[in-house]
Amino acid sequence: MQSDDEILDRIRGTLVQLFQLEPADVTPAARLYEDLEIDSIDVVDLMDEVQRHTGQKVTPEDFRSVRTVGDLVAVMQRLLRA
């Protein structure tokens, strides 16, 4: 099983690659919409990346409560345990 730090590193790399963000801006407390300016279309791309990484089907319900990078780490941990 991957640690939260390993998942955070993976998410950081994905966000930097997909959305040209600064790595230092991608912290567990960073809010996806407000701080990182990720919009609803970007979330679809992000869901696809999570699905690819976890091997689990990702639904909109999985992302309903995701507001921060830390929330995304928690979702990925849950999917990896499934």
Regions found by a protein language model. Name each.
Residues 59-81:
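C-terminal structural segments of small proteins and small subunits
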Residues 12, 29, 47:
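Generic structural marker for isolated residues within well-ordered, non-membrane alpha-helices
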Residues 1-24, 77-82:
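Thiotemplate assembly-line natural product biosynthesis machinery
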Residues 6, 31, 68-71:
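Residue-level recognition of oxygen-bearing side chains
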Residues 42:
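Two-component histidine kinase catalytic core, primarily the HATPase_c
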Residues 24, 34, 61-64:
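Pre-signature/interface helix of ABC/ABC-like ATPase nucleotide-binding domains
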Residues 29-36:
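N-terminal helix-turn-helix DNA-binding core of bacterial DNA-binding proteins
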